[in-house]
Amino acid sequence: MNGFVNWYTASVKRSPRLTNGIMTGSLFGIGDVIAQVGFPEKKGQKYDLARTVRAVVYGSLIFSIIGDSWYKFLNQKVIVKPGKHWTNTAARVGCDQLLFAPVGIPMYYGVMSILEGKSLVDAKKKIEDNWWPTLVTNWYVWPAFQLINFSLVPVHHRLFSVNIISIFWNAFLSFKNSISPSDKKVPVNFPPVPE
């Protein structure tokens, strides 16, 4: 493992965008494979390579750039009290969860919908259906991890550490994104009928 970390550190210093793009895209792809193989929407559903490619494209070309820039911004600009490590770390986690997550989640659903060839109306519907439940789930997972990440991990490794945990988060996102509105369970009396 130490050899890999040394290789990654050298690669990210030499070519940060390329290294982060390859790593992030690969791990988004792994998350999608886990979602498709481990949690298929329908029994006997075949593996969809195009879906995995979309996840890799999103991770490589969009999230890697935004995520790396965001973590550097937090480290450089979110300093509540110079020299107060835990205060600054808590402020960074707060910014991450209250500013980035509420925007990043709809960005994911919107971009994935467009990459799937869906209309802007469909993308908007996907966001409306999934934003709040995904954000709440995000708050169960990420604040504790980000507290550790922002306090112990050097800034140039933060995207990588997030990407490792994100394998499972990406599997969750990929699964949520793959559920069509017709797959969702609705009450028998839906839409509600006045009594």
Swiss-Prot record:
Q: Which residues cross the membrane?
A: 21-39, 55-71, 98-115, 159-175
Q: Which domain of life is it from?
A: Eukaryota
Q: Which GO terms describe its cellular component?
A: mitochondrial inner membrane
Q: Where in the cell is it found?
A: Mitochondrion inner membrane
Chief localization: mitochondrion
Q: Give the bilayer topology.
A: Multi-pass membrane protein
Entry's Pfam families? Mpv17_PMP22
Q: Which UniProt keywords are listed? A: Membrane, Mitochondrion, Mitochondrion inner membrane, Transmembrane, Transmembrane helix
Note the InterPro entries from the entry: Mpv17_PMP22
Q: Which family does it belong to?
A: Belongs to the peroxisomal membrane protein PXMP2/4 family.
- Stated role: May be involved in cellular response to stress. Required to maintain mitochondrial DNA (mtDNA) integrity and stability.
- In Swiss-Prot or TrEMBL terms, this protein is called Protein SYM1
The species is: Kluyveromyces lactis (strain ATCC 8585 / CBS 2359 / DSM 70799 / NBRC 1267 / NRRL Y-1140 / WM37) (Yeast)
Gene for this chain: SYM1
